From Swiss-Prot:
Protein purpose: Component of the telomerase ribonucleoprotein (RNP) complex that is essential for the replication of chromosome termini. Is a component of the double-stranded telomeric DNA-binding TRF1 complex which is involved in the regulation of telomere length by cis-inhibition of telomerase. Also acts as a single-stranded telomeric DNA-binding protein and thus may act as a downstream effector of the TRF1 complex and may transduce information about telomere maintenance and/or length to the telomere terminus.
Main location: nucleus
InterPro entries: NA-bd_OB-fold, POT1, POT1_C_insert, POT1PC, Telomer_end-bd_POT1/Cdc13
Subunit comment: Homodimer or homooligomer. Component of the shelterin complex (telosome) composed of TERF1, TERF2, TINF2, TERF2IP, ACD and POT1. Binds single-stranded telomeric DNA as a monomer. Associated component of the telomerase holoenzyme complex. Found in a complex with TERF1, TINF2 and TNKS1. Interacts with TNKS1. Forms heterodimers with ACD. Identified in a complex with ACD and single-stranded telomeric DNA.
Keywords: Chromosome, DNA-binding, Nucleus, Telomere
Sample GO molecular function, one term: single-stranded telomeric DNA binding
Name the UniProt record assigns to this protein: Protection of telomeres protein 1
Length: 640
């Protein structure tokens, strides 16, 4: 690399960037994702930068060459981008690379040499650039928290996420979506580390050297999109792994609990939280520090009687390369953090295997991680039911002809002319030309004695058929089927909707409702628009809720369990009340189910679901059984 003299560049502060321009910028790295393979053939890197204006800019950078993307090692590094195109994405400015894009990266620590990292053979760097880097360093030292996730193995604790700088000693392909890295950083973990069996694997590296280092070596499993990068790394290289997950794995149950605990290391699939791998050059300052640590490492003097090789082949906690389709521990770890569902509460609960849940009494709450083996009903429209929140009864939603018959059978008597035109409503009655001269009355509810606009008007209809009710509901705010009572209008029947708004029909519970006369709607005046809850309250109706009632068959490899899904509007983020009449929502629901329970492939390839389950007792006749229900769980945003 060499410097070239050129006319000074103009750099734009981040708060002055404009959509549609091409700019040169400096910034401090606030967040980044190391280069990863995008959905196409290019590599992608995401970088969020900030400058003295305290404005952030996220940049999406693509290149067919891994090395052409910014060489960023940690949060706090300083970058210079030339020819960055500014566009708007989701109402925020975003930077993307365009023709001629170039980048430099600098260590962000005050006092360190100002040395540029770049794959370019020539680049410009002036005294003014030097001043800008040093000014950003000083500003960042006061305003940006230094990255605290970089740790040594000796400081690693379970159930955390870390960045690790290390040297690669050996590697092996476990299967198409899992790859083993054996690494060290010169320090030893507090707990013994988990060992992956290499007996049936094609291993690259010096096993005798690894055996001499013994407990200074840890096994790391990387998954999915990281496998391609891991496969290309040469043994002996220095690495930084980002967002490495540590957790405890119980070992041999025959030993004491403290002796059997082992520390696992996993680099999960995906790029969330900046997860990834970066090869560090030998000239990097952090590699210099690592080399000193490796040279000064306290190597074990003697081997234990078991030795690493024996442990790798015989340790009960070791991972075997099973070719079966059963769910295995590493199969689950591979997909952690990319679950198709997320928890909205109770994240503190520890995960419980299904085999343990099936042996315990109810009621209990559990956190599980499993795959959706199957579900019922297969016709998703049949899953929409009506649930009473008070008595918990469930009933079918009346459809088409059945609803029309309910309206027809309930409206057998002609409207009572004495109940026309009260202070509450204005009435209009007409007689149909066919159908035996059926009389239909429409009562327009007033607001403070005045008829409101149709978009705000509630109308009461007597003697109407489904086609007439549907036509009126498309033109007026709300429609209520009623009949003439002895002294005033009454709700038609709770077999029919008590309120219709657009295409949505609102029903009430026959068992729990205590109906009041229509005149009670007077209590709703001056209280805003007509809502199902306010109308139900005024008329003594306990409204039924639209829910998806489904049965999920869950499988985590230890057991199979059937669980009800009732809190499904929260789960799917789709209103159950609208899915029956909205083709787009039906397609969305089908898409979600196809993603969490894909047709035409083996269960092994299904995504994992992280769910909360609650168990409860149910008595049916003389039989007492335990049922399970999914709660406080929702489909992840990338699935919806």
């Amino acid at each position: 690399m060499s410097l070239v003299s050129t006319a000074p560049y103009t750099y734009t502060p981040l708060n002055l960037l404009k959509e549609g321009t091409i700019a040169n910028v400096y910034g401090v790295v606030k967040f980044f994702k190391p280069p990863y393979v995008s959905k196409g053939t290019d590599y992608c890197s995401v970088v969020t930068i900030v400058d003295q204006t305290n404005v952030k800019l996220t940049c999406m950078l693509f290149s067919g060459n891994y090395e052409a993307l910014p060489i960023i090692y940690k949060v706090g590094d300083i970058v210079r981008f030339h020819r960055l195109k500014i566009q708007v994405y989701k109402n925020e400015l975003q930077g993307i690379n365009c023709s001629g894009f170039a980048s430099l990266t600098f260590e962000g620590t005050v006092g360190m040499p100002v040395t540029a990292r770049t794959s370019s053979k020539v680049f410009s760097f002036t005294p003014q650039d030097q001043k800008m880097v040093e000014a950003l360093r000083v500003w960042a030292s006061k305003h940006i928290s230094a990255s605290s996730t970089l740790v040594q193995l000796c400081d690693a604790q379970p159930m955390q996420y870390y960045d690790l700088t290390c040297q690669l000693l050996g590697k092996a392909q476990v299967d198409s979506t899992a790859f083993l890295l054996k690494v060290w950083d010169g320090t030893q973990t507090v707990l013994p580390s988990w060992r992956v069996s290499t007996q049936d694997l094609t291993f690259e590296g010096d096993l005798s050297h690894i055996e001499r280092l013994q407990s200074l070596v840890v096994d790391i499993l990387v998954y999915d999109n990281h496998v391609q990068v891991a496969r290309s790394i040469e043994v002996g290289c220095f690495l930084r792994l980002y967002s490495l997950h540590t957790k405890l794995q119980p070992g041999n149950s025959e030993t004491s609990s403290s002796e059997s605990l082992r520390l696992e290391f996993h680099l999960h699939g995906g790029t969330s939280y900046g997860r990834g791998i970066r090869v560090l050059p030998d000239t990097s300052p952090c590699v210099d520090q690592l080399k000193k640590a490796l040279e000064g490492a306290n190597l074990p003097v003697t081997e234990t009687s078991t030795g690493i090789c024996q442990s790798e082949n015989g340790d009960s906690s070791a991972l075997s390369n099973s070719g079966s389709g059963a769910v295995s521990p590493y199969e689950e770890e591979r997909c952690q953090q990319v679950s198709a569902t997320i928890l909205t509460n109770h994240q503190h609960l520890e995960k419980t295997p299904l085999c343990a849940i099936l042996t315990q009494k109810a009621p209990q709450q559990y956190r599980v991680r499993a795959k959706l083996r199957s579900y019922l009903p297969r016709r998703l429209s049949q899953s929409v039911k009506l649930l009473c929140p008070k008595c918990h009864s469930v009933q079918e939603v009346p459809h088409g002809d059945s609803l029309d018959k309910i309206l027809q059978d309930a409206a057998t008597e002609a409207p009572d002319i004495k109940l026309k035109a009260t202070s509450l409503y204005y009435s209009k009655v007409w007689t149909t030309e066919d159908q035996g001269g059926r009389q239909v009355a429409v009562h327009f509810v007033k607001n403070n004695g005045i008829l409101p606009a149709s978009s705000e008007c509630l109308i009461l209809i007597e003697g109407g058929r489904l086609c007439e009710v549907s036509k009126l509901s498309s033109k007026f705010h709300s429609v209520m089927p009623v009949r003439s009572g002895p002294e005033s209008l009454e709700l038609l029947t709770l077999s029919a909707p008590f309120l219709i708004q657009g295409k949505v029909h609102h029903y009430g519970c026959k068992q729990c409702s205590s109906l009041k006369p229509i005149q009670n709607l007077n209590s709703r005046f001056h209280k805003g628009p007509w809502t199902p809850s306010s109308v139900a309250e005024a008329l003594g109706v306990v409204p039924l809720q639209y829910v998806f009632v489904m049965v999920f068959t869950l499988d985590d490899g230890t057991g199979v369990l059937e669980a009800y899904l009732k809190d499904s509007e929260h789960f799917f983020k789709i209103p159950a009340s609208e899915v029956l009449t909205d083709d787009d929502l039906q397609r969305s629901l089908e898409t979600i189910m196809d993603m969490i329970c894909p047709p035409g492939i083996k269960v092994d390839a299904y995504p994992w679901l992280e769910c909360l389950l609650k168990s409860y007792n149910v008595t049916i006749g003389t039989e007492r059984r335990i049922c399970y229900q999914i709660f406080d769980t929702t489909v992840a945003e990338n699935v919806v």
